[in-house]
């Protein structure tokens, strides 16, 4: 009997669920604090958030952002809690969604290549916890790729905000907002490329196409990099 891939990605031991939810709560709380400080321009928390807040509030700023998803979403609550709080919370929610989506796809892929169902409950729990730790490690390490005192295009930018030269993407909310869609797009691209020559069906491209569209509408530069690779 063929397994449902959606259920395979969602099913998890209680120990695995508790570990993931605890780390997700902790991670999201820390990120929300960071985004809140950035949106309210607390000294020492430089970012592009002030320009994003102005966009949500309808105030003309120094830049135009022709990719609307993040700003549309933030405006849903801005009328009630203000543009600054709305942008901070919206960015945190997109960041949370990226972690949840990555965890789902990692679970699904692990179950494809391992005999998960044949493991004892203890080993299943250990597998779930290891996958969770791997997911959070990926999200943390993706922001720490630059060694200290490394120069890039002539800039010694370690631990400082230097606009597009900053190694830490937490300063850029549009990048964070596109990650949920980009992660879906990545895994669905792998699926389409692995199946299109032997069992291609147009309906299997739906999620790939939608995620690519949403990614482009959230951060077009992602598409400029990914589409040529495909």
Where do the language-model regions lie?
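Start-transfer (signal-anchor) and selected internal transmembrane alpha helices
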Residues: 1-34, 114-133
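Perimembrane helix-loop-helix junctions
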Residues: 1-5, 225-230
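Transmembrane-helix motifs of polytopic, lipid-linked glycan transferases
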Residues: 89-118, 184
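Membrane-interface micro-motifs in multi-pass membrane enzymes
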Residues: 126-190
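Helix-to-loop transition at the C-terminal end of transmembrane segments
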Residues: 32-49, 144-152
């Amino acid at each position: 009997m063929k397994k449902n891939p959606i259920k395979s990605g969602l099913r998890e031991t209680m120990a695995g669920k508790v570990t993931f939810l605890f780390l997700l709560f902790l991670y999201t709380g820390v990120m929300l604090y960071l985004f809140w400080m950035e949106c309210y321009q607390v000294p020492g928390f430089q970012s592009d958030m002030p320009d994003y807040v102005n966009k949500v509030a309808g105030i003309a700023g120094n830049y135009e952002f022709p990719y609307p998803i993040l700003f549309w979403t933030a405006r849903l609550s801005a009328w009630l809690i203000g543009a600054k709080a709305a942008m901070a919370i919206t960015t945190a929610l997109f960041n949370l969604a990226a972690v949840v989506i990555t965890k789902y796809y990692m679970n699904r892929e692990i179950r494809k290549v391992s005999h998960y169902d044949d493991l004892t409950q203890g080993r299943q729990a250990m597998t779930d916890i290891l996958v969770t730790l791997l997911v959070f490690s990926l999200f943390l390490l993706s922001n720490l790729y630059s060694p200290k005192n490394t120069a890039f295009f002539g800039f010694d930018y370690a631990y400082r905000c230097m606009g597009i030269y900053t190694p830490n993407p937490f300063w850029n909310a549009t990048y964070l907002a596109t990650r949920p869609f980009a992660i879906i797009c990545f895994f669905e691209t792998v699926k389409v490329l692995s199946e299109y020559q032997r069992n291609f069906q147009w309906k299997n491209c739906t999620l790939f196409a939608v995620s690519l569209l949403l990614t482009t509408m959230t951060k077009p530069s992602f598409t400029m990099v990914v589409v040529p690779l495909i």
